[in-house]
């Protein structure tokens, strides 16, 4: 439908509104699902307040899940099982090594997808589709529309014996339609069923009471003003809405109904104004057509002028090259003729040899003088051969780098719209890419277009992918592993756009991101380590207990390392994870360890203050991670005092200055179980700092150790957690 047709239809609807003659068919546009473009079927209300069919939401999540698995399978094996520890003791490590232990894939399911109605990313949270309300009001309106569309088709009784009679009413409690006789039979007078609520024949049955999706046995009886959604009393008492402002459902119903009625009355009362505005819009449309054609002609004229300049320069450059080529070829031809003459001097040489046979001195001198001059000239030519011209045209290469950059930024006059700037500190890449930018407040843009593309050295041109964004940040998903990507942003205000921002290059991790949390049951020392509730951050407390242990330390004994591991293990495939070590940390170790090695480290923990017990110090001077075995079942690197220590190696320099690097802001660990290799990365630049072989014949776990004061924070996955939606009326 064209714009003029839509405006005419809107004016027609307004006219019917004023006369109170709007029928159900005039609102069909509001009853179409933005995803499947068909009438709504069991519509669900998304967090952005738009409605989408239940099946469409599931299909969107399923398609995202398929693409997520496809990306993961490209960089790892088809099967990459992860083992979750369940036992509170060390027996769980023994258990996973026994034959027959079932390994389950715990690949996280995506819960974020773009709303088909507004294109905003919506996050369904942990409950997913189960946490969404069903839009019963919209469902009822759709059913009325369907009934109006099939008015000639009767709804038959569900309880009649064949052939069934036409139904006359539908019971909302029984969710069935009845003819008069069957309704009397199944709803006898004086019984509880006689009190059931019934309506006209319908196929749309909805519950009489709206239940809370988070607390399925509780009725909805309140309205959260902050989240703009109905809630139950449990949501208010101890749920996600405990600190939110809520009101009673009756009060919210009254307020919203008054607002809606008032707005409808306002629209109906503005019929004449709407008609005049429609006329104005028609004039503006005609003016837009004329101005658009004029702007198009002006743009073509500007480009024709550029083409003329390029053609003129092209002609001049080609003429200069042709002239230089002709001059050089002439010189080469002249020189070639000279050397061709040298070949003809073979006769001269023979003639000179015959002259040498002359015995009469007077005759010889008379002839040899001129002959010697000719021979001498030929000899000099052979001694100093130099081409008469250069064959290379390097001086005639056209430099178009600056012109290419200028032409690439060729755009409309921006009317003062500044170029947005990408915030490099806030932008990052992990499981997804988060791109953040800012724009001067005085040049507030209506929207932005984020462009990105993979940088492929083998291909000259790769097209840019575009995403329209209404905020100043965006999460970009489905990026290929181990690939550099370029990002840039353009601002739009009305129909004017700014030039593109400076490009930001981010390199994706070498493998899919591996999700896990710290294990609070296996080897976790509650006396020295403090784990937060989310189990993604651990701190080491160098307090009174450590001082007491140090007081009794004997010769050959060192303060122990406190180990903590991830709650998920892997047996095959490629995996990547990252963590941040706090700058104040004294000594921290990060890496991987096999289940067998963990048993050795964590089984039968002894008193750190015992003078008989000697434990590995964890230092490079004699630590196990500094051993020179070609392949061992663990690898840990040492980090502390704002330094990153590369472990000792027999193949490289072990001088301290060559092994000590500045501590990165975030450290990435890449485990390739198939190749038996672990690598450590600087996440800021996605640069490999150290790698070595590791024995992956057993289940491998992320392993960490702390000594003294320190802290480790697991890198949080990038998701569309904090979303902003436009305020609805």
From Swiss-Prot:
Main location: cytoplasm
CDD domains registered for this protein in UniProt: Bbox1_TRIM36_C-I (cd19848), Bbox2_TRIM36_C-I (cd19778), FN3 (cd00063), RING-HC_TRIM36_C-I (cd16756), SPRY_PRY_TRIM36 (cd12894)
UniProt zinc finger (B box-type) residues: 154-192, 207-249
Biased composition (Basic and acidic residues): 613-622
Gene Ontology biological process terms in this record: acrosome reaction; microtubule bundle formation; mitotic cytokinesis; regulation of cell cycle; regulation of microtubule cytoskeleton organization; spindle organization
Domain Fibronectin type-III: 416-511
Keyword annotations: Coiled coil, Cytoplasm, Cytoplasmic vesicle, Cytoskeleton, Metal-binding, Repeat, Transferase, Ubl conjugation pathway, Zinc, Zinc-finger
Localization annotation: Cytoplasm; Cytoplasmic vesicle, Secretory vesicle, Acrosome; Cytoplasm, Cytoskeleton
Catalytic activity: S-ubiquitinyl-[E2 ubiquitin-conjugating enzyme]-L-cysteine + [acceptor protein]-L-lysine = [E2 ubiquitin-conjugating enzyme]-L-cysteine + N(6)-ubiquitinyl-[acceptor protein]-L-lysine
Tissue: Expressed in testis. Strongly expressed in the neural tube region in 14.5 dpc embryos.
InterPro entries: B30.2/SPRY (IPR001870), B30.2/SPRY_sf (IPR043136), ConA-like_dom_sf (IPR013320), COS_domain (IPR017903), E3_ligase_FN3/SPRY (IPR050617), FN3_dom (IPR003961), FN3_sf (IPR036116), Ig-like_fold (IPR013783)
Pfam families to which the protein is assigned, alphabetical: COS, zf-B_box, zf-RING_UBOX
Disordered: annotated segments: 606-626
Gene3D superfamilies per record: 1.20.5.170, 2.60.120.920, 4.10.830.40, Classic Zinc Finger, Immunoglobulins, Zinc/RING finger domain, C3HC4 (zinc finger)
Purpose of the protein: E3 ubiquitin-protein ligase which mediates ubiquitination and subsequent proteasomal degradation of target proteins. Involved in chromosome segregation and cell cycle regulation. May play a role in the acrosome reaction and fertilization.
SUBUNIT field: Interacts with CENPH.
Protein name as annotated: E3 ubiquitin-protein ligase Trim36
Organism taxonomic ancestry: Eukaryota, Metazoa, Chordata, Craniata, Vertebrata
Gene: Trim36
């Amino acid at each position: 439908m064209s714009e003029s047709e839509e405006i005419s239809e809107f004016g027609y609807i307004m006219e019917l509104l004023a006369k109170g003659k709007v029928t159900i068919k005039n609102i069909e546009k509001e009853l179409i699902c933005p995803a499947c473009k068909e009438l709504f079927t069991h519509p669900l209300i998304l967090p952005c307040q738009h409605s989408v069919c239940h099946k469409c939401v599931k299909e969107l999540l399923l398609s995202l899940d398929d693409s997520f698995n496809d990306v993961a399978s490209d960089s790892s094996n088809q099967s990459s099982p992860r083992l979750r520890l369940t036992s509170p003791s060390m027996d769980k490590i023994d258990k996973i090594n026994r034959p027959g232990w079932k390994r389950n894939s715990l690949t996280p399911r995506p819960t974020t997808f773009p709303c088909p109605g507004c294109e905003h990313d919506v996050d369904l949270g942990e409950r997913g589709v189960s946490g969404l309300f069903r839009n019963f009001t919209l469902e009822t309106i759709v059913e009325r529309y369907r009934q109006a569309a099939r008015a000639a088709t009767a709804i038959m009784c569900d309880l009649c014996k064949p052939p069934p009679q036409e139904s006359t009413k539908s019971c909302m409690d029984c969710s069935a339609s009845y003819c008069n006789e069957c309704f009397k039979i199944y709803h006898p007078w004086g019984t509880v069923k006689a009190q059931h609520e019934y309506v006209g024949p319908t196929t749309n049955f909805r519950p009489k009471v709206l239940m809370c999706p988070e607390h399925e046995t509780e009725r909805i009886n309140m309205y959260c003003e902050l989240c703009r959604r109905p809630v139950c009393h449990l949501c208010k008492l101890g749920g996600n809405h405990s600190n939110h402002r809520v009101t009673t459902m009756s009060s919210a119903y009254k307020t919203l109904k008054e607002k809606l009625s008032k707005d409808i009355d306002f629209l109906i009362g503005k019929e004449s104004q709407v008609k005049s505005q429609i006329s104005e819009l028609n004039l503006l449309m005609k003016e837009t057509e004329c101005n658009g054609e004029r702007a198009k002609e002006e743009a073509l004229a500007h480009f024709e002028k550029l083409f003329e300049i390029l053609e003129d320069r092209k002609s001049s450059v080609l003429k200069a090259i042709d002239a230089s080529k002709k001059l050089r070829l002439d010189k080469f031809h002249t020189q070639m003729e000279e050397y061709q003459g040298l070949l003809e001097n073979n006769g001269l040489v023979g003639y000179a040899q015959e002259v040498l046979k002359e015995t009469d001195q007077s005759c010889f001198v008379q002839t040899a003088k001129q002959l010697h001059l000719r021979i001498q000239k030929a000899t000099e030519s052979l001694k100093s051969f130099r081409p008469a011209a250069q064959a290379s045209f390097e001086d005639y290469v056209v430099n178009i780098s600056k012109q290419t950059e200028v032409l690439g930024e060729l755009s409309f006059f921006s009317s003062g719209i500044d170029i947005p700037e990408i915030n490099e500190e806030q932008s990052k890449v992990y499981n997804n890419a988060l791109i953040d930018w800012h724009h001067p407040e005085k040049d507030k843009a209506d929207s932005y277009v984020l462009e990105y593309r993979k940088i492929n050295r083998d291909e000259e041109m790769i097209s840019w992918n575009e995403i329209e964004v209404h905020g100043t940040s965006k999460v970009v998903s489905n990026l290929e592993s181990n690939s550099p990507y370029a990002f840039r942003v353009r601002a739009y205000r009305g129909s004017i756009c700014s030039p593109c921002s400076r490009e930001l290059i981010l390199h994706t991790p070498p493998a899919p991101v591996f999700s896990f949390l710290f294990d609070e049951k296996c080897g976790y020392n509650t006396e020295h380590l403090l784990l937060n509730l989310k189990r993604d951050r651990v701190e080491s407390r160098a307090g009174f207990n450590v001082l007491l242990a140090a007081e009794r330390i004997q010769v050959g004994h060192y303060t122990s390392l406190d180990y903590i591991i991830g709650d998920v293990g892997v047996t095959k495939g490629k995996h990547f994870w990252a963590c941040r070590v706090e700058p104040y940390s004294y000594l921290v170790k990060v890496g991987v360890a096999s289940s067998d090695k963990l048993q050795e480290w964590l089984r039968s923990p002894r008193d750190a203050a015992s003078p008989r017990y000697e434990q590995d110090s964890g230092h490079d001077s004699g630590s196990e991670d500094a051993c020179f075995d070609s392949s061992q079942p663990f690898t840990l690197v040492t980090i502390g005092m704002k330094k990153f220590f590369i472990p000792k190696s027999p193949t490289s320099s072990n001088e301290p200055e060559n092994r000590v690097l500045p501590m990165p802001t975030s450290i990435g660990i890449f485990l390739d179980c198939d190749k038996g290799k672990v690598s450590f990365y600087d996440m800021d630049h996605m640069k490999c700092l150290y790698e070595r072989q590791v024995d992956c014949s057993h289940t491998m776990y992320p392993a960490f150790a702390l000594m003294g004061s320190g802290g480790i924070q697991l890198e949080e996955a990038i998701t569309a957690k904090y979303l902003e939606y436009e305020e609805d009326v």
